[in-house]
Amino acid sequence: MRLCDRDIEIWLDEGRLDIAPRPPIERINGATVDVRLGNQFRVFRGHTAAYIDLSGPKDEVTAALDRVMSDEIQLVEGEAFFLHPGELALAVTLESVTLPDDLVGWLDGRSSLARLGLMVHVTAHRIDPGWQGRIVLEFYNSGKLPLALRPGMLIGALSFEPLSGPAARPYNRREDAKYRNQQGAVASRIDKD
């Protein structure tokens, strides 16, 4: 059963759930907390690689990822990031989220943005128990027009679901946690699998 707005407020007040900066009451709705777009992005740069063999030798996968992913792009206040039709880009939420070991989170995009063709997460919308950091957004523009995305705009909503008990292997205590405490638009670390 997912937390309702009253329970989200209680969990925030008690420090069991942390969202920084803490959202105002107007952004806690029914069963979700609205999150905003941060100012860090990462895109695929122009490349000549025919493909990336995701099951190939780790050093080859790492080299291929280094060739195709851009450095992190950091926007200054007032700037827009333009996501063109058919493009994939990574970004982060403005808010940093810390989940306890007995709570899982879910990220959903906004319906109003989806109706313009913007996918906020391509597949990864679960936020594991024990997570700490900013949430990476996997943007895809399936629409017909470029979309101007500005830091601070409402971009999605988080919901939270208590588990039957604390996780034995919460995310931030796992040795194989590839995105532990991420603060920026971290590129794929598939080569660390």
Curated annotation (Swiss-Prot):
The keyword Isomerase does not apply. Residues 169-193 are annotated as: Disordered. CDD domains: trimeric_dUTPase. The active site is at residue 138. It catalyses: dCTP + H2O + H(+) = dUTP + NH4(+). Keywords: Hydrolase, Nucleotide metabolism, Nucleotide-binding. GO terms for molecular function: dCTP deaminase activity; nucleotide binding. GO terms for biological process: dUMP biosynthetic process; dUTP biosynthetic process; nucleobase-containing small molecule interconversion. DCTP binds at residues 110-115, 128, 136-138, 171, 178, 182. InterPro entries: dCTP_deaminase (IPR011962), dUTPase-like_sf (IPR036157), dUTPase_trimeric (IPR033704). Pathway: Pyrimidine metabolism; dUMP biosynthesis; dUMP from dCTP (dUTP route): step 1/2. It is an enzyme of class 3 (hydrolase). Pfam families: DCD. Its EC number is 3.5.4.13. It comes from the Bacteria. Disulfide bonds: none annotated. Belongs to the dCTP deaminase family. HAMAP family: dCTP_deaminase. Catalyzes the deamination of dCTP to dUTP. Homotrimer. This is dCTP deaminase. It comes from Sodalis glossinidius (strain morsitans).
